[in-house]
C-alpha cells in the first residue's frame, strides 16, 4: 500500500521518517559535467540541505538541478485532451511531490487553498541527455515507478540521478551531501571547502543521528 508521507507519524504526532531505499554511493571522482541531476523541493528540509551543499561547493554549473512544486498533489491524475488515447489513472488516495508543467502554473492545495505561482520555464527541463526524446513525468511517484516498477514508496526527494545510466543513485540526503562534498571536486568552484572535515566527523555524525 502506498501512503502519503504525512501519514508517517508516531502516536504522539511526530513525523517518523521512513528509511531511504536507494543507497548507492558515488565511488569514483566525477568530472563529467551534468551527468548527474539533483531533484529537490524547496519545501523539504532534507532536500534543501543538499541544495545548500551544492551551492556552497559551487556545483551549480556541474550538476543539473530540478525543482518540484512545493505543494503536494494527488499523484494519480485524469488524462488531458492530449492523452485521450490513454486510460485514466485510478486515484488511490496518494498525494506527494509533482513536477510543474506549462499548463498548470497555479496548483491548488488539496485543502482547496491555492498555492503561490511557480514559474515553470526557469527550472523545468527534464530532457533525455542524448537529446533524442523528452520523457514526461507527472509526479515523483511516476519517476520512481518508471525506474523500478516494483517500488512501493515512499516517493521522496531529494533524488540524486545518473542521467547517463538512467538510474536513481541515492535518495538519502545525509549520503548525498557527503558525496557532493567529496566526489565532484573537478566540477566544484569551491573545491577546497570541506564541509565534512576529519576533525569534526564524529561530532557531525552524532548530530545527524
Where does each model-flagged region fall?
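GST-like domain detector, emphasizing the conserved glutathione-binding G-site
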Residues: 1-209
